[in-house]
Amino acid sequence: MSWSWQRRWCGGIEAVIFDVAGTLLDFGSCAPAGVFVEVFAAEGVAISLAEARGPMGAEKRQHVRELLFSPAIAARFAARRGRQPDETDVDRLYAAFVPAQLACLARYGELVPGALETCRVLRARGVKLAANTGYSRDMLEVCLAEARRQGLELDDAVAASDVPRARPRPAMCLLNAARLAVSDVTACLKVDDTVPGIEEGLAAGMWTVAVAVSGNEVGLPLAEWQALPATEQARLRARAVDRLARAGAHLVADSVADLPAAVAAIEARLARGERP
């Protein structure tokens, strides 16, 4: 007879790790998308907002790379330049992206509605609050300053430039968890609006909650979202929910305003001995 033993964390959620743009602040994740369009346009290569949003969640140099080497955009680049793109083009585009992104981040720094109250509720329950992001450290610091200005202080924050390889690999989440000194990775919850961010949380062995409406999948500023007819809101929400659920998110919510209920649902699953 053979035996196998499994350890299970049956306590509650000890830490929530938020993505930044489209999750904690910048409803619609608008800051990065527009800059990618502008940077490629300056090279004489037109890309759509939908194309710019495709790799969202990735480290920003990698985001540039994935855009540039996608078949459709690479073909446009070749038609313009008479050659295929290479890594020197990635370097040049990223070098143009960084100052443009830094220049506009504060304009998109408003917290997602409900974010501050959600964080207050979680703190009152003893939950630690952290963030990680596809932004570089300099970009993240601008976002953190905007969050602090509105009354939100986090316990830890990791930028994509802080780790050797970022999303969808788990390094940022694991660094957050280590610095927060959590009991177990299954006591952590990753909240994100992108597929790479959800995949990152899953790779780290954590619970994941995707936010569908406030983030990249719908991709609209708050005022534009609120102005839509209910039928169009329902269509866009359903499309976003389907994509994020297919990425493996344990739960999908509209925004971080819904997170306390999601945490309660996950804690009930933990109490039953379930694992991510």
What are these regions (language model features)?
Residues 3, 9-116, 120-125, 141:
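N-terminal helical cap/lid subdomain that shapes the substrate entry/recognition surface
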Residues 23, 133-135:
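Conserved phosphate-coupling serine/threonine residues in phosphotransfer and NTP-handling enzymes
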Residues 28, 133, 212:
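Glycine-rich, histidine-containing beta strand-loop boundary motifs that form or position
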Residues 89, 107, 132, 164-168:
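Short, well-structured alpha-helical patches and their helix-loop capping segments
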Residues 1-14, 116-124, 136-276:
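Asp-based, Mg2+/Mn2+-dependent phosphohydrolase catalytic module
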